[in-house]
Amino acid sequence: VYVMPGLGGIKFSDRHASDTAELLTKASPDYIRLRTLEIFPGTPLESLQKNGEFQEAPEEQVVKEIRTIIENTDTETEIVSDSAANLLEINGSLPGEREKMLDAIDSYLDLTGREKLEFSLHSRLNSFIGQYGGLTGDIYEKLTPFLNHNTLNISGASDNEIRSVITLIRGKLMP
């Protein structure tokens, strides 16, 4: 079964997570694959977003959705997070590895706002490089001010600069 954290947007995030956990408990699938929502250009969801009918949930809220799903799904199953769209790699079996997965999520949630941004950037960069074998020119150009001998140092980057790179990368990742 594929589950799409973030599909409820900001408005329905909590309900989406709790309803998903309830449905998964009833369905008792062998595998649950997490595929975080990505809004692609030219899609009906992008149109809804542009006209204000849909507000995309921020990454932290999506991570909280995943936490709710794992915490409240009461069945034997495997959780697999193998999509480039996912911020965190959360893999394990329920119920046996529930605490391990929740601990990994809580480690992220315990980060400061800046640490979450930096984590997101590194996660997205690793996903992109893993998927495409390198960076595109536009991503490289945005990172150039923060590269020193091919080592990324974003300590001098503003939060908005980091968000801008994350947005660019997410727009290019294939789910």
What spans do the regions from the language model cover?
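Residue-level signal for functionally critical sites in structured catalytic/ligand-binding pockets
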Residues: Y2, A17-T20, S83
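Auxiliary Fe-S-binding modules of radical SAM enzymes
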Residues: T25-R33, L37-P175
